[in-house]
């Protein structure tokens, strides 16, 4: 099994457990796929534990995904708020199945 790990993990493992095998990913497409897997892992950890600190891991992975995709997350975030709004009003929609696609950007 392999998965993306943070930069300092090999050193931390070597200090406590001994050997840590790892490799550096050079291929951007593979790195992007590993980041997507990591995002799923981190979201599942948050959903399982409900720990707010897990959100930091999610945000970190999202930041790296945006970097690889060469997109400005802040710009996209602000654009999405302008076009679709936020969640300030705490609205809940009731839709027949299947749910409508609304401004999917």
Q: Where are the regions that the model predicts?
A:
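Flexible "arm" and connector segments at domain edges
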Residues: 1-105
């Amino acid at each position: 099994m392999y998965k993306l790990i943070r930069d300092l993990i090999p050193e931390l493992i070597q200090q406590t457990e001994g050997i840590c095998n790892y490799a550096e990913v050079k291929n951007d497409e593979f790195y992007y796929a590993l980041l997507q897997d990591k995002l799923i892992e981190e979201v599942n950890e948050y959903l399982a534990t409900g720990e707010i600190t897990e959100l930091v891991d999610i945000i970190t992975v999202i930041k790296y995904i945006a970097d690889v995709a060469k997109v400005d997350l802040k710009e996209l975030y602000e654009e999405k708020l302008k076009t679709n709004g936020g969640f300030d009003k705490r609205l809940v929609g009731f839709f027949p199945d299947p749910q409508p696609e609304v401004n999917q950007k």
